[in-house]
Amino acid sequence: YLIPEEAERDIESPTLAYVQLGLFMFGALAAVIGYLFGIHEGREFLEQPLWIKVAITVVALIFLYNVSLTVLKGRKTAISGVLLLGLWGTAVFWLFAFYDPANLSVDKLYWWYVVHIWVEGVWELVMASVLAFLMIKMTGVDREVIEKWLYAIIGLALFSGLLGTGHHYYWIGAPGYGQGI
């Protein structure tokens, strides 16, 4: 709903969106069934078998294709730009889930890239853009004011979120400067 409304354009390919939904539902169901029968990699939050991770990546790429073309061919706003940055960041940091080193410390280093930077980094961009969209639509506040605050919010969220990731690295043997931050 948000993307077509903000871009003032229909979604690029509704058929592709339905294909993506079907693949997503199949992958989610397969992952849950796999968890029930003990078919997983054993990494917390990243325990999906490789073929499900590949399916998640394909679904994400279909989604990004559809959303990106909708925004790029429609009206470009700060809200849609921040939303696209967050969605692409989510996809990029997901790629670290494929790397599964034998060394536990190295594994945790990359694990935090996916888990922590998602939550306190790129998902903050998605949430801030959705919040800005809702503020404009529900309160009638001027778009310029909301977009200025959007930039302030995402700047603070990214800065504090990325710094906040550093304290996790202390416990895996990385330099201790992240602990003090």
Where is each model-derived feature located?
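Histidine-centered catalytic micro-motifs
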Residues: 1, 108-122
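Membrane-interfacial alpha-helical segments at the cytosolic side of multi-pass membrane proteins
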Residues: 1-6, 122-138
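Membrane-interface helix-loop-helix modules in multi-pass inner-membrane proteins
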Residues: 1-74, 98-102, 161-181
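Membrane-interfacial loop-to-transmembrane alpha-helix junctions, especially the N-terminal start
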Residues: 8-25, 77-87, 140-156
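Hydrophobic membrane-spanning alpha-helices of multi-pass integral membrane proteins
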Residues: 22-28, 59, 86-93, 124, ...
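Hydrophobic, membrane-embedded alpha-helices of multi-pass small-molecule transporters
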Residues: 91-97, 117-128
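Conserved, charged catalytic cores of large soluble enzymes
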Residues: 99, 107-108
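Membrane-embedded translocation segments of transport machinery
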Residues: 115, 129, 136, 143-181
